Amino acid sequence: MAKSTKRRPAPEKPAKARKCVFCAKKNQQIDYKDTTLLRTYISERGKIRARRVTGNCVQHQRDIAIAVKNAREVALLPFTSSAR
């Protein structure tokens, strides 16, 4: 006879409600020249972090992506990381 392979369901964790930083601070603007702000949304490999990681809303995540791409074109941010 085969063993029963029923698994116990994982306990449900309450969903952590994250607020968009830019929605919380109404006066904070996303600018491609602000590299210190944009570097917080870029991984070590040079990729733009996902919205589920950063916790931003859809509109502000799009604005960040556009600002990062503009900063890369103007050579304020690298396209890839320098560490290999």
From Swiss-Prot:
GO terms for biological process: translation. PROSITE patterns: RIBOSOMAL_S18 (PS00057). One of its GO terms (cellular component) is cytosolic small ribosomal subunit. GO terms for molecular function: small ribosomal subunit rRNA binding; structural constituent of ribosome. SUPFAM superfamilies: Ribosomal protein S18. Keywords: Ribonucleoprotein, Ribosomal protein, RNA-binding, rRNA-binding. Binds as a heterodimer with protein bS6 to the central domain of the 16S rRNA, where it helps stabilize the platform of the 30S subunit. Part of the 30S ribosomal subunit. Forms a tight heterodimer with protein bS6. InterPro entries: Ribosomal_bS18, Ribosomal_bS18_CS, Ribosomal_bS18_sf. Pfam families: Ribosomal_S18. Belongs to the bacterial ribosomal protein bS18 family. This is Small ribosomal subunit protein bS18.
